[in-house]
Amino acid sequence: RRPDMTAARPALFLDRDGVINVDRNYIYRVEDFAWIEGAQDVIRRFNDMGWWVFVVTNQSGIARGLYTEEQMQALHDWMGEELAKSGARIDRIYHCPFHEDGTIARYTKDSFDRKPKPGMLIRAMTDFPVIKERSFMIGDKQADIEAASAAGVRGFLFSGGNLASFTDWVLADMGEGR
């Protein structure tokens, strides 16, 4: 069931590669995708807690001509279908296809959306009623943490392992324990 789209609630911001799925460089095909242990459970748990769940992901492979936005979208659609099987959902996936060193002209530029800049998080907080003070970001790179900080939310660096165990620790650290 979808939450009330007008009610303000905290948000969980997740990086994709290295947090939701194993980072194997430029993932855009289902057959190359492997869930991080605990990732689906975390998304479902935060859905059940009434939080927004957003993915904010740099996808420079698009600018570099390695895959298309349509191929990336097909993977994101598949992720949504897989999550739905376990009663979980991502409220929106924000992606940045731009990179200054791209090879595809229309994507070769600097962008406020490209982490460590905060554009994708700010867009999510503009598109949805988010309680910023209780929201946080989990990423596997310093750029994720810097983007969170620039957007005014806390950031936590995930270095691998079980994402559910990690978010238990984060919630306790934030005083949001279950």
What is each PLM-predicted segment?
Residues 2-54:
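Active-site neighborhood of HAD-like aspartate-dependent phosphohydrolases
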Residues 14-16, 57, 138-140:
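Active-site flanking residues adjacent to catalytic metal/cofactor-binding acidic residues
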Residues 17-18, 95, 120:
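Short, flexible segments with low predicted structural confidence
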Residues 20-37, 62-71, 85-88, 98, ...:
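Metal-dependent phosphoesterase signature
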